[in-house]
A protein has these predicted regions:
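Hydrophobic pocket/interface hotspot
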Residues: 3, 15-16, 33, 92
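Solvent-exposed loop/turn segments at secondary-structure junctions
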Residues: 22-25, 71-73, 107-110
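Short, charge-rich amphipathic alpha-helical segments embedded
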Residues: 26-35
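Exposed acidic/polar residues on beta-strands and adjacent loops within beta-sheet cores, strongest
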Residues: 31, 55-59, 108-110
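Short beta-strand edge/turn micro-motifs at domain boundaries
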Residues: 64, 82-110
Length: 110
């Protein structure tokens, strides 16, 4: 299953399994990724993540994808979802023949 599927399911452990131990995002390391997505999943009824128009480039070790994203989150008790969209960068390495995310960065347009 991919990042968007685990995000939509709110499956924290399987989402985290897509990330390498050394993974980072804007606000910190894998511990921060766990904390932020855990809070989001606990406090939302419904989520969707769309990523498209990704252009991939790589140097053999690191593969970088740059594209667009939209996240829709319906928080518990809210009547309508919050929608954020913008640019996303995903950095991936191969470890034991498995792709793992080492960087996930997004910039919302609001």
């Amino acid at each position: 299953a991919n990042l968007s599927e685990q995000y939509q399911r709110g499956d924290l452990e399987n989402l985290l399994a897509l990330f390498d131990a050394s993974a980072h995002m804007e606000r910190g390391d894998k511990k921060q990724i766990r904390a932020e997505y855990g809070e989001l999943f606990r406090n939302s009824e419904n989520r969707a993540l769309y990523i498209w128009d990704v252009a991939w480039s790589g140097d053999g070790k690191l593969t970088r994808g740059e594209g667009s994203y939209q996240a829709r989150v319906l928080r518990k008790g809210d009547g309508s979802p919050q929608i954020r969209s913008g640019a996303v960068t995903i950095e991936v390495i191969q470890r034991n023949d498995k792709p793992l995310i080492v960087g996930l960065y997004h910039k919302a347009d609001y």
